[in-house]
Regions:
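Short, small/polar residue-rich loop motifs at catalytic or cofactor-binding pockets
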Residues: 102-104
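Short, flexible active-site-adjacent loop segments at beta-strand->alpha-helix junctions, enriched
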Residues: 11-15, 51, 79, 114, ...
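C-terminal accessory region of radical SAM enzymes
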Residues: 33-35, 39-46, 66-91, 96, ...
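Radical SAM/AdoMet-radical enzyme domain recognition
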Residues: 1-64, 72
Length: 171
């Protein structure tokens, strides 16, 4: 496996009851997959739980359980997708002063058919930057420049007004 490849296995719980209430069936398969990923990828494999009202009571158990197996335990903040999902976050980590979105600056979210929405938060594809298959990567990437320039100018319109992910980024 290429050394640049890493994998995050989203589990959200270390017990079948909590896992089932969040994700449904499949706890045994998911945890077995996480174990195999750790064995195969070592430090490039991560296990993750999303911190929310649903998981808060089990996070310490999750962390302790997986920390025995790997250093790569990720506790991720809850994402409400610009208020399209219920707000069930436990704490507000939003910076006091708004700044331009890390995702508009660094990320390109490509759907399986090649369409590229404004960002990963645009789950309804309200703003399409283009299609990497028909428009090409450079043209599609360039189509987002105006949105980022708006952010630099302090203008946050559309779904960006409700976004709580602008300050997060993936390494």
């Amino acid at each position: 496996v290429d050394d640049r490849f890493s994998l995050i296995v989203g589990l959200d719980a270390s017990n079948p009851e909590l896992y089932g209430s969040i994700r449904g069936a499949g706890f045994e398969e998911a945890t077995a997959f996480a174990e195999r990923a750790i064995d195969a990828l070592g430090s490039r494999a991560h296990v993750q739980a999303v911190r929310s009202e649903l998981t808060e009571g089990g996070l310490e158990e999750f962390y302790k359980h997986w920390k025995q197996r790997t250093e790569n335990v990720v506790i991720q903040k809850y994402d409400h997708f610009c208020r399209r999902l219920p707000q069930i976050r436990v704490g507000d980590l939003t910076p006091l002063n708004r700044f331009p979105c890390w995702h508009l600056q660094r990320d390109l979210h490509v759907l399986v058919d090649g369409r590229v929405p404004l960002c990963r938060e645009d789950i309804s594809t309200q703003v399409l930057l283009g299609n990497v298959f028909t428009d090409g990567l450079e043209k599609t990437w360039a189509a987002g420049a105006g949105h980022y320039a708006d952010h630099v100018a302090g203008t946050f319109s559309g779904i960006c007004q409700e976004c709580d992910e602008y300050y997060t980024f993936s390494f």
